[in-house]
Amino acid sequence: MEEEILWAEKYRPKSLDEIVNQKEIVERLKKFVKEKNMPHLLFAGPPGTGKTTAALALVRDLYGNNYRQYFLELNASDERGIDVIRNKVKEFARTVASNNVPFKVILLDEADNMTADAQQALRRTMELYTETTRFILACNYLSKIIEPIQSRTALFRFYPLKKEDVVNRLIQIAKNEKVEFDPKGIETIFDITQGDMRKAINVIQAASAYGKITVETVYKVLGLAQPKEIREMLHLALSGKFLQARDKLRELLINYGLSGEDIIKQVHKELTGNEISIPDDLKVILVDYAGEVEFRIMEGADDEIQLSAFLAKLALHAEKYSGGK
């Protein structure tokens, strides 16, 4: 059914012409389509910036509607072993390419999760089948790709998408799906997802279940407290009102079902932002301590005890606090 389709897939660009961002990359890829020739490619950049989309659009433009016959997509996170290289990749690389385009394409998504041995095997396979196959490797961290592969590929760096591009795309999707929205809700999605288009579209789809996309519904679907509530808790602690701050903490833990890790990450963001006025020397102390608390929580320490201790530390520094917005 239509409503069950993931919007991130439904609105994924089908051709290079439909990709509105990463313009320099798109222009370079279009030249490959025009010439019907290309080197092995390495797409590097954060999640949700269009690496897989660009690869799929490229092969669609190269082969047309029958692109699946000449294209193999593997996720290296699911299949990290050397057998993937020796079996699936080699089997596909041996088969005949299209008459129109003299090579087939293999996309290895999340290639930075491949083992070093698998990458070495891939390097040898790339050399062996260069005449009939082109490889596109997509990774989040370029440093995790071995140098012999980097030297055999053309590098394309993908950057987080601009706010204007993401917001406009989300508004277009909301209108197309006939979902009411508050512009601040759309902007909040960008502020949280930070240029990750796939995550942003997933959030807007989840928030649409509430009937209207607002700041409140966005934070609800993400399981996060609104920044103003985190600031209220910090303000109480920094004003010396430890017990009230602890009550607010318990409210966040119980009412929102937040984990201690979720809360301390939001606390860190508020401490390093501009909404709370804290002297720089105090800010350094608190951010450092927030890091310690997050480490202990991740190691299995009790969420409430660790966060209460953090609030107590804030309360002890109350005389240095000059208030906040």
UniProtKB/Swiss-Prot annotation:
Keywords: ATP-binding, DNA replication, Nucleotide-binding. CDD domains: AAA, HLD_clamp_RFC. InterPro entries: AAA+_ATPase, ATPase_AAA_core, DNA_pol3_clamp-load_cplx_C, DNA_Rep/Repair_Clamp_Loader, P-loop_NTPase, Rep_factor-C_ssu_arc, Rep_factorC_C, RFC_lid. One of its GO terms (molecular function) is ATP binding. GO terms for cellular component: DNA replication factor C complex. Gene3D superfamilies: 1.10.8.60, 1.20.272.10, P-loop containing nucleotide triphosphate hydrolases. The keyword ATP-binding applies. The keyword Transferase does not apply. Belongs to the activator 1 small subunits family. RfcS subfamily. This is Replication factor C small subunit. It comes from Sulfolobus acidocaldarius (strain ATCC 33909 / DSM 639 / JCM 8929 / NBRC 15157 / NCIMB 11770). The lineage of its organism: Archaea, Thermoproteota, Thermoprotei, Sulfolobales, Sulfolobaceae. The gene is rfcS.
